[in-house]
Structure formats: C-alpha cells, structure tokens
A protein has these predicted regions:
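Helix-coil boundary/capping segments in enzymes
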Residues: 1-179
C-alpha cells in the first residue's frame, strides 16, 4: 500500500462559511487562498477533492493523510471565531474521511490558547468524529500575543489527552514572525 503521509485539501469555495470571508478569515477567490490582505495561489488543482482523487490514482497512491490548513490555526483570533473556524475545518476533514474511508485519514486541529475549548474539541473529534490524528502547529500566539512553542508546559494537557485517546500527533511547521 502506498500512503502519502502529508496532504492538504481545500474546501470548494461554496463550502466555506460566509462569515469566514466577511471577517477576512479565509476564502478562495481567483484561484487564490485569501486571508485578510494575504494571498497565495492555489498551485495545483489537486488541492480539491475531485482532482486529488485523480492525482492519487495517476500516482498509484492508495491512501492519503489529510492535514489541516495552516491558515486556519486561528492565531490571534478571538475565542468565538476560533471555535467556529476550527469546528468548520474539523467537520470538513471528518466529512472527507467519512465519505472516503478507503482513501483518506483525516487530521484535526485545536488552538492551544483556548485550552478548555481545545480539550473539548479533541474529545469531540476523536470520539464522535473518529478522527485519529491531532495536528498541531510548531508554535502559537499565547494570551499575551507572544509566539509560544507547542512544547510549552501550558500545552501538556493536550498531549496528555491525545495520549489517553491513543491519537497520533503531527506537528506541522508554521510560519511566524518570530519564535
């Protein structure tokens, strides 16, 4: 079996909740990922499900691990927006794994700043959505708006719960001004 251990899927533009574009959080437009004033080209059609499946078939890839979009780690977002965005992203990834279990293993993300919400979301994703992989950024913005390593002691409860639930943990490089 051939497994691609690091893949990303973009939701189609009509799948992204309106509030995310209205608030400048994330949307797709003119073949670009958009976030506030930031733009990044969608460099390959295989970022979308239909083309991803074609790409996997043409490259003889049996299964792919779908990681979360780093644009949606929710650094600097208020608690309500963080909750809504993370829940959207995790539900989207769960739907992919549910609809194509033979093709995808989906990860989910939490924001360590809001530790109680993060722990609840881990339980929801692992138990209710049956997602086996917790995706974490290398660092995140803390309550003082300072970049903090994911290895900080404040994050220990996340790792303890992941261990209790027998989750795989993937730490994804994340670009930030400083760490």
């Amino acid at each position: 079996m051939r497994i691609n251990g690091h893949g990303h899927l973009l939701p189609y533009p009509n799948q992204i909740p309106k509030f995310m574009k209205d608030k400048g959080i994330f949307w797709l437009e003119n073949n670009q990922m958009c976030q506030g004033n930031w733009r990044r080209p969608v460099t390959d059609p295989s970022f979308f499900l239909d083309k991803k499946l074609e790409w996997m078939a043409s490259n003889h890839i049996d299964k792919e691990v779908i990681l979360n979009l780093s644009q949606l780690y929710c650094n600097g977002y208020n608690r309500t927006d963080t909750y809504d965005v993370i829940r959207f992203q995790n539900d989207y990834n769960a739907s992919i794994q549910h609809d194509y279990p033979e093709k995808f293993i989906s990860g989910f993300v939490v924001q360590p700043l809001y530790i109680d919400d993060a722990l609840s979301e881990i339980r929801r994703c692992a138990v209710d959505l049956k997602l086996p992989l917790l995706c974490l950024p290398t660092h995140f913005l803390n309550k003082d708006n300072k970049w903090t390593s994911i290895a900080d002691e404040s994050v220990i409860p996340i790792f303890e719960l992941a261990n209790e639930l027998n989750l795989a943990v993937e730490i994804h490089p994340y670009n930030a001004e400083e760490i």
